[in-house]
Amino acid sequence: MFDRINILKQKGYSPDLILDIGAHHGNWTYSMLQIYSNCEYKLFEAIDYTELNRYNNIPNITRYNAVLNNKIEEIPWYEMRNTGDSMFKEKTYHFDNCNIITKTTNTLNNLLVIPESIKNIFIKIDCQGAEIPILQGASNLLDKTDFILLEIPLFGQYNENVPSFLEHIKYMDSIGFIPYDITDNHYINNFNMQLDVIFINKLHPFNIVVNELLMKK
């Protein structure tokens, strides 16, 4: 994954703000800091893992203990304290006897006020099927967002009631984003069940550059 993101940097892309949504223990942010060390980071995680305390006193990193959604409401939360925790129950045996907790959700629109100084946002969402609801609650951020990295289903259904691959593509198109790159394939029992896909804002200059480069001799 990070080799693909590093190529973005080599092409001249540098975000002002990176949102790590579904931060878990913060390992994704740690790897991103090796690429973009100076930008602002905001980490969102439903569980207050002690592993995230390493970011407590870093000026350009802010943590949020929140379950993100498209509205503020109480929802059933399926929790085993691992990467499968979600409002959409994982369909593996690991969650056969999981704890069901009532949690109150929040939205990015409610939690964040983006200052004028922030012009370029990179969003990563890995939330076990909640990607579309989270983006529905983030409409105020999208005009300044260049790239959105999502984990989306491809074949089969890993979580209950999650939109399909095609529904994700159509939704992203409806909010002004198209596929840019595939950074990872997640094979389970030799089936390619999930993809990590970077979507690009349709108005980003790379949409013009890609075709201009085709014409160069």
Regions from the PLM with identified roles:
Residues 1-217:
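Phosphate/nucleotide-binding beta-alpha loop and adjacent structural elements of enzyme active sites
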